[in-house]
Amino acid sequence: MILFPAIDLKDGQCVRLKLGDMDQATVYNPDPAAQARAFEEQGFEWLHVVDLNGAFAGETVNGAAVDAILKATGNPVQLGGGIRTLEHIENWLSHGLARVILGTVAVRDPALVIEACGKFPGRVAVGIDAKGGKVAVEGWAEASELGVIELAKKFEGAGVSAIIYTDIDRDGILTGINWDSTLELANAVSIPVIASGGLASMDDIRRLAAPDAAKLEGAISGRALYDGRIDPKEALALIRAARKA
């Protein structure tokens, strides 16, 4: 079980959105590299980064900020947002990313994801963002008719290192993780699942540490960490205890 602190990048700054709406962005730190260092100093072992502008543009927009983050932290970093081609993937992995997260392209071109997994084993994750049970693409701006589990099953046996599952209806509003849909997905596939969207309090951390959540690889926390609703020291102690159980 891993707790991933999140850095969402918009216009070079560390922000959080409400419900994935770019017009509802709160700036939490104008210096993403400093934020990355702070998370490492707090004891976190990984970092989850999203290029929000890139997700809408279909290509990297906040590259300078990501490079600064990679230089600032010794922790492994996973990046999503605007990564749509093998060239994009190879470029970022050569820059020092631990793994890339493929979202829109996983819907548009599943074969590319499978090819990437073969070329970069263990370094490709799939991001599945859902609204009303259906997969959303293009920075959450478009809905598809594809179901979450239907999409996830396309990558069984392909070598996908993890699925990052985000419930858009809960993202950034501190209402708690959608445990039913998250655990349903985790139990439907053999690929490790990381929960995202809605992590709200220490109660959610305790729920993550419960035995029935053991199938999850971890969870991503953004706003609850920035707002002080989750205490890093206490949360990490609970997560580490769950690993040993």
From Swiss-Prot:
Keywords: Amino-acid biosynthesis, Cytoplasm, Histidine biosynthesis, Isomerase
Gene3D superfamilies: Aldolase class I
A GO term, aspect molecular function: 1-(5-phosphoribosyl)-5-[(5-phosphoribosylamino)methylideneamino]imidazole-4-carboxamide isomerase activity
Catalysed conversion reaction: 1-(5-phospho-beta-D-ribosyl)-5-[(5-phospho-beta-D-ribosylamino)methylideneamino]imidazole-4-carboxamide = 5-[(5-phospho-1-deoxy-D-ribulos-1-ylimino)methylamino]-1-(5-phospho-beta-D-ribosyl)imidazole-4-carboxamide
EC number from the UniProt entry: 5.3.1.16
Location of the protein in the cell: Cytoplasm
GO terms (BP aspect): L-histidine biosynthetic process; L-tryptophan biosynthetic process
Active site residues according to the UniProt entry: 8 (proton acceptor), 129 (proton donor)
Enzyme superclass (EC): isomerase
Biological or metabolic pathway of the protein: Amino-acid biosynthesis; L-histidine biosynthesis; L-histidine from 5-phospho-alpha-D-ribose 1-diphosphate: step 4/9
Superkingdom of origin organism: Bacteria
Main location: cytoplasm
SUPFAM superfamilies attached to this UniProt entry: Ribulose-phoshate binding barrel (SSF51366)
Family designation: Belongs to the HisA/HisF family.
Protein's UniProt name: 1-(5-phosphoribosyl)-5-[(5-phosphoribosylamino)methylideneamino] imidazole-4-carboxamide isomerase
Organism from which the protein derives: Sinorhizobium fredii (strain NBRC 101917 / NGR234)
Name of the encoding gene: hisA
